[in-house]
């Protein structure tokens, strides 16, 4: 746009009107960047190699961790609401978690623009760092019932993280709380399932499937539980898609080479595709 021929003061007034009276002076006010702490966020990328493509690799993983932070925020709150029997807020939170997984599924397409040649250039600079060591991802798995105490070991060098993950390991999962809620509403769940060690993780239990079957056979009677069950299925469905896209992205970039963290890479990721978080909810579909 051509400079306005009027005075500076008049120009400033015209400019403010042109931008629909948007605030333009933040000398004494909080700006967008101030609120989001963008100076810190955008100054947290430190490539170790001289290669152009490492920035993509860093930002891909940093943004994934930010989405996982939100996911944990929602899952922790949803679990508390289920525990207290307040399913309305929990259902909304679980729907949001599913959409976060969908967001992360689409994000793999960006990393997939990195070719094997490009990745091989930066791989020597990564050391043994690996997504396998993500403590936020580990807590997500624990909240969803996929628990294994051995997976605490990569965090033993960080006392505060280890303590938080140990607490997550021994806290009943979201699914544990859903099962307890069914029992509280009079559905027949075995006492053994209700008092089992929370750190043991989820495994199939016949009485739980029987209870869920009653919910599905009489949804009008157990409408909130019926909705909860479907939200859990939605969540695991999206999680499975994320895992599958993870496998295919890694395979197209590194093939079947070992991962930087020492795992079998694609072989390990493929084995995780067989993980079932809510087994009774899936099995009952064959038995309805």
From Swiss-Prot:
Keyword check for Metal-binding: yes
GO molecular function: heme binding; metal ion binding; tryptophan 2,3-dioxygenase activity
GO terms, biological process: L-tryptophan catabolic process to acetyl-CoA; L-tryptophan catabolic process to kynurenine
Substrates-to-products reaction catalysed: L-tryptophan + O2 = N-formyl-L-kynurenine
Pathway the protein contributes to: Amino-acid degradation; L-tryptophan degradation via kynurenine pathway; L-kynurenine from L-tryptophan: step 1/2
Similarity comment: Belongs to the tryptophan 2,3-dioxygenase family.
PANTHER family found in the cross-reference section: TRYPTOPHAN 2,3-DIOXYGENASE
Quaternary data: Homotetramer.
Protein's name in the database: Tryptophan 2,3-dioxygenase
Organism the protein comes from: Pseudomonas aeruginosa (strain UCBPP-PA14)
Gene (UniProt): kynA
